[in-house]
């Protein structure tokens, strides 16, 4: 008798890999799949880095506070003008390391929130209809990342120059002190530019959250109508 070969279960097809992006009638640009796509790279990074960056910022602020006390004590005890100038530059540099770390932590936290919307929204659509639409990364989200990077680079450059100027102060010569004061005034603009870029990126991140919430509210209604129309 011929032996019967047991039927092998056929491999289930999946389209978790997104199809080409397409624009919906309501102007949202999405990719379609039958499963949630999970987090993208910036959202994964946000999950991992928001807490370490926040801790780094708090530590930098604490160090700047201690350096501020040291500098005020140097002024009170009539320490050398060169030492006071050096401490001024170092304290400012450490403080702005704290600023860039905390503002970056906020940006990473926004990316983490967007990741929750993306992953959980995909899971809900998978369970409800099996037809998932995932937003492509909006221009505002890309701008948020770019603004954070530019702000961080501006502040890091300013901090590096503060340290360089502090190391260049020699004794209490008038030339060294004048150069240190001039650099302090010039770097203030660079620091403010960096903080401004950070804040602009955070605004873009909040605008992205609003954009995602608008899409998800519309998509929830669509899924509910699909469920109601199905037999």
Model-derived segments and spans:
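Short membrane-interface loop/juxtamembrane segments of multi-pass integral membrane proteins
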Residues: 35-39, 123-140, 176-186
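Alpha-helical transmembrane segments and their immediate juxtamembrane interface regions
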Residues: 165-211
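Alpha-helical transmembrane segments and their helix-start/interface "positive-inside/aromatic belt" motifs
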Residues: 40-58, 136-153
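Short, charged cytosolic
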Residues: 2-35, 120-128
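Membrane-interface segments at the starts/ends of alpha-helical transmembrane spans
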Residues: 43-46, 80-96, 177-194
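Hydrophobic alpha-helical transmembrane segments of integral membrane proteins
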Residues: 4, 129-161, 222-231
